[in-house]
Amino acid sequence: MEAAAKTVTVRAAPLGYVYVTPIEALRRDLLALLVARSADDAAAVAPLVRGLTVEAGFAGHVAVVAGARTTGLGGGLTLKLTPNHFHPNVFFFHNGDCVPPSSAAPALSRACEAARARFGFSAYRTPVDNAEETTGAEVCARLGLAADAHAAYLVVADGFKEAVYLCNAFLHYGGAGTVSINGHEAWRVPLYPVHLFMPDVNRLVADPFNAKNRSISEEFVYPRPFFNGPLCRLLHGYVLGPAAVATRVRNLDAVARGAAHLAFDENHESAVLPADVTFTLFEQRRRGGDAAAGGLERRMASVMSADAALSLEALVAAGVYDEEPPALDDWPVLSEAGAKDGGAAAASAGAPVSQAAALGAYVSRAAGLVGALVFSSNSVLYLTEVDDAGAADARKEGAGPSFNRFYQVAAPYLAGNPQTDKDGRVLLHTASQPATAPGNHDFAMDHLVMACGFCPQLLARVLFYLERCDAGTFVGRGDVDAVRYVAGSLDAEVPCSLCDRASRPACAHTTLHRLRHRSRASARRRSPMGVFGTMNSAYSDCDVLGNYASYGALKRPNDSEPPKAIMQDTYRAAVDRLLADVAGARIGETVTDHAGFRHALRALRDTVEQAADRFVRTLVETRDFKLRDALYDANHTMSLSLDPYSGALCPATSFLARRTLLAVLQDLALSQCHGVLHGQPVEGRNFRNQFQPVLRRRVVDMLNGGFVTAKTVTVTLADGIVAPDPTKGSAEPPARDHDGDLARVSFEVLRELRVKSRVMFSTGSGSLSDAARARVAGLAGAYQRPDTAVDVLNGPLGFLLKQHHATLFPRGKPPGGQSPNPQWFWTLLQRNQLPARLLTKDDIETIAAVKRFSVDYGAINYVNLTPGTVAELAQFYLANLILRYCDHKQFFINSLTGITMQSKRPRDPAAVMAWVRRPLADAADAERAAREVLDAPRDDTWVATYTSSHLLRSVMASRPLVVLGLGVSKYHGMAGNNRVFQAGNWSGLNGGKHVCPLMVFDRTRHFVLACPRVGFTCSQTGGGAGLHDHSLGEHVKTILADGGPLVQTAVYAAVLHALGARTQHLEPDDWRAIVDDEFLAAALAEINGRVADRDGRWSVEAAAELVRDLEGQTGADGGEETAFDFGACGAGGDVAGLAPASLVPAELGGKRPPPEDDLFDMGAPPEKRLTFDML
């Protein structure tokens, strides 16, 4: 559904500013945590933040003076104004080294140039002929400022950054003025396009330094265009490099010229990329049709989709959005309360935390997101080629254009292959390059450099995050120990192309070695994309049943009922009321004895049952709602904002958002390519120029088709247009009486990407094709609910039993054990091996109540998640009761899990090797140097960690930065409707635990990685590809599945065997990441703490001895004494006490159902009721 049109007022402004700021005015302690800078280059990229890099009153959306038109017979000038917004980052080109580098890794520029040469992407050179450089020192001198005491950086409109790179702008010193940044006076010099001196020119000026250009009016005083070498090199790396890699265009200047032309000619719809675009040579699979023709069509689809993506990205760059640039004063993380929150990991005792430390703790959370996209083989960072599934056989009935023929694949390992022209002829200068065959390949430094667009600043920022990815701790391979690697390389004098002995700890190769457990690149196949995005709204439908019984579904047409009354009957409102009731009753919080525990179970049962009964009766009796039919229309939904300022925490997050946008736009364009190419003379010389507008219009027509939403924005111009007088020099004051017209008054602005996941799994209708039927059959086994006995600790009450085990069963500990152990107790109990003498009458009653509850819940459970809190249990129970009312059977539903990023101070020396700054004397000195870093933590020494929650709506309410898998399906509407609709399907990230330790491969579950923003940078407002992890995580998973009375001992032994001495540094968060169980993690941390208590110090030998002692403790010490019969427990007595009333048969005294269940229209009562024998 299209959004309502919006009217925005903007003021006329230049296309950019050069800020000259005193170095002392910069908050360098904060910039050091946000900037992207390489240690071997003074240029830097920093976020555009009001109060940090620009003044507090800076306006992010403007009407850029983009040129001039002649009007009237007298040849008067009218300025051409283009709506635009400023780029979310600023570019330091003078004294950028006043800010520390993002990473101390040496020679990153050398690494980028080496990878660029290997993969055939063009190197930087002066963008135009006869360029005259304007240095930062010269700018300072023109303003009368000391060059060595000031830093200069560019703030530029998003649509015109390529125009600045191509020297199509000039500095207007006459319009320079001062602003206040951080209480200091800073100068800013406006940048205007040279087109002011070339009326009616709506194209890129190829030779801006030619003062004799025929387009320049005779009476105009033409200025010197602005060219700065470090700035252009920076724009070449950060702006052009990622776009070139994403669009497979190896000539970066061609990308710049195309984007700059679109900035000046808003009506251009034809091709913007040149005809000499090259393509990667790789073997195409033999499918239907002629292979040669297929290769030509694949290459044409590749370049046309890239062209369309650049064209539509220009539309996004010229958009006017809702949010203004972030303001430093509005970041709660920097306020006093925010600092305590942000630094909670370090300030557990309530000690004050500096703003820099709080911000350092927060930005380290984002390391989990960046690492996920680096470690996931289906990440948008690696979508570097276009593949062809082959045209359908024309002899078959119904053969025609397909949405799925062309698609992007993750194939960075093919980038070094020879290159061809559009006809498939290999270029001579690349013919000697080896051709890599498709398949699995090792991930190398060059691939990471390519993913970063060969930009050393961006590479340094990504390394900043990878240095904070501590997931390598959980792999269980000794060869990834960074301390051992550095020590060994010092002894062996291992040669490295980037570092020497002194800089070996900080070397990028050291960081990648520590994280080398990343999966190999997957085979070339169609798969979902791993994308980055931002939740800009606190609203999402991520409850267990998604948007079931939503406001839109309940509202009747032409009904005047107040919206508030309708909202009260929705599923969302029912969940809110239930959670409020559970929280108000404090169920499970104050358990002090057996009676209190059993009362809590009864209270929970009654609360959930009453909520479900009230909800369903209201829908059926009052709303005449079709419960069962609506269930199959329910979806989990969320929206990712395309607002450029929402995800601009740092240059790396802006980069990830851009790569995601380019990947999505190309995915849409590729789906239409077959329809454009079908039956056309693709080999024709003018084919692209003729059909590129057709493809562009088709992609634009897909907006508001279910996936990418857009809205119409109407722009009005504020009074007063200030611009240079072209008849005077650039040092003269601007004129204030210009006339101006907006180039576009109303235009489409892209808003969001809508992501959804169907709640129900369906085997489909009879109209499915054979291939679709086979896919559904393969999925059915994964969704089939197994018919197995309920495991109490892994059931609905497992978390409560672990939490209150010491209170309820203080004698439930193994012989010789020091503390009650729920794993030992319930394992022996369910195996009928627990001595009956250890149990009292209260114990037995509680055990019977727990068993009945667990069995009753398991009989109706179709949510393939184990609750970890009372709120999760209440939500799952409510959803299961609703599913039972709808007569749902057989299959699990799709479930969501949110993995929230956290941060902590590191404890493992291997995690801090990259932060060692002093020279190492010898191999033995490596660990000492690492411990010195641990003992003296800095503001930026944090590492990322994770925590999971199944209450995803609360996670999404924090408006987080997110990473998730996304697949886009396309389909036509109803018969006779040719419009193409899409669905953004929630999918997975390939790599499993390599991506995040808490992720598992389960087709019934979808994960989202989230870094919260609310409370930090904004205020509160009203299937994988089958890759498996066979390291420590898989081993632990097997141990937990096998169970046993002392499962924590087996897990601890496995971890000790895999990690050795590093086990000493594991904290409760680390143990939780390994076992994904808060209470088991606490038991493992307690075992780890007992090691040092034995001999006064921790050692591997002492830990192994403790493990042997624990393994020697037998499950039962009673010899021949009678064991408690768990199977018979609960077979008699008050069975109805904990069974849901709707499940209790009438003969046992429950609520008697009516003779005919007309209320729910779901058949006769005997077919719905569970008998006592079934229970």
Curated annotation (Swiss-Prot):
<feature type="short sequence motif" description="Required for filament formation">
    <location>
        <begin position="825"/>
        <end position="826"/>
    </location>
</feature>
<dbReference type="Pfam" id="PF00747">
    <property type="entry name" value="Viral_DNA_bp"/>
</dbReference>
<dbReference type="GO" id="GO:0003697">
    <property type="term" value="F:single-stranded DNA binding"/>
</dbReference>
<dbReference type="GO" id="GO:0006260">
    <property type="term" value="P:DNA replication"/>
</dbReference>
<dbReference type="GO" id="GO:0042025">
    <property type="term" value="C:host cell nucleus"/>
</dbReference>
<dbReference type="InterPro" id="IPR035989">
    <property type="entry name" value="DBP_sf"/>
</dbReference>
<dbReference type="GO" id="GO:0008270">
    <property type="term" value="F:zinc ion binding"/>
</dbReference>
<dbReference type="InterPro" id="IPR000635">
    <property type="entry name" value="Viral_ssDNA-bd"/>
</dbReference>
<keyword id="KW-0238">DNA-binding</keyword>
<keyword id="KW-0479">Metal-binding</keyword>
<comment type="function">
    <text>Plays several crucial roles in viral infection. Participates in the opening of the viral DNA origin to initiate replication by interacting with the origin-binding protein. May disrupt loops, hairpins and other secondary structures present on ssDNA to reduce and eliminate pausing of viral DNA polymerase at specific sites during elongation. Promotes viral DNA recombination by performing strand-transfer, characterized by the ability to transfer a DNA strand from a linear duplex to a complementary single-stranded DNA circle. Can also catalyze the renaturation of complementary single strands.</text>
</comment>
<protein>
    <recommendedName>
        <fullName>Major DNA-binding protein</fullName>
    </recommendedName>
</protein>
<keyword id="KW-0862">Zinc</keyword>
<keyword id="KW-0235">DNA replication</keyword>
<keyword id="KW-1048">Host nucleus</keyword>
<comment type="similarity">
    <text>Belongs to the herpesviridae major DNA-binding protein family.</text>
</comment>
<comment type="subunit">
    <text>Homooligomers. Forms double-helical filaments necessary for the formation of replication compartments within the host nucleus. Interacts with the origin-binding protein. Interacts with the helicase primase complex; this interaction stimulates primer synthesis activity of the helicase-primase complex. Interacts with the DNA polymerase. Interacts with the alkaline exonuclease; this interaction increases its nuclease processivity.</text>
</comment>
<feature type="region of interest" description="Required for nuclear localization">
    <location>
        <begin position="1151"/>
        <end position="1175"/>
    </location>
</feature>
<keyword id="KW-0863">Zinc-finger</keyword>
<dbReference type="InterPro" id="IPR043031">
    <property type="entry name" value="Viral_ssDBP_head"/>
</dbReference>
<feature type="zinc finger region">
    <location>
        <begin position="496"/>
        <end position="509"/>
    </location>
</feature>
